Amino acid sequence: ELLNWLQTRFGYTGTQDGALAFYLGLPAEQQRVFARSVYFNELQAGGREYNDPTSRRVGSYLRGRQAIASLFPDKDAQGRPIQRDGTITMFGPSGIRTDFGGGIQTLTPGGKLIVGVEGQVPPVTSGLLTQGSGDIQIYSKDSVLLGLSRIMTTFGGGILVWSAEGDINAGRGSKTSLLYTPPLRVYDNAGNVTLSPQVPSSGAGIATLNPIPEVPRGDVDLIAPLGTVDPGEAGIRVSGDINVAALRVVNAANIQAQGESRGIPTVALVNVSALSSASA
């Protein structure tokens, strides 16, 4: 994995044996980019193994917890406890957005992530949004809460949320559709074609959208080993597959996925016709 990353990002042409030495010679900022990539990949794999009956670690969060312990150990090199604090709170129109590609990663190892608070409805640009291709990856020690805001990939890309000790709640945002200009093919002077990322971003909650066939579907992974996953009133919409691993899942009927669903309890449907016949 390191070799491929170095070749893609830096054009590394050396051997696999020399890859580590090359990596250690990079600036600390670049080393952290790769470390975060590996970290979130491990969290995602650990969450999926939990619901994979063919995995040796089915029903276990061991892989993810080992990754967390590696990046955020409880003690320093001298054996002294490490105290971490801090919560990310996004008020009103605040948020993080990328245009024309680029992912979003947030780490709150000492607190919670609050994306939008209750009260005045925020604008559609608030929350965590990728408006080109790009993933959203979130780790929080405590809960990940959406008030009236959103976490969305609107033009391809997946969403990963791991709450180590808290809940994941998609909030109470409105589902009212807000229509925008559909994506258009844009041609430059050389005849190259790009797609405009200004796509419909309707409603709130958690969603991966693929508004046109050219856009790949995005998967969603929600992991809360000690908490509850709740789509709330805003709901969770997934253009690809969804994997949920949590102590409890509620309001499962408000989770919509076009692909495969894992870890979501089956919603019992009431046979209205049978009830009507019985009461006749």
Regions found by a protein language model. Give the residues of each.
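Low-complexity, glycine- and small/polar-enriched segments
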Residues: 1-280
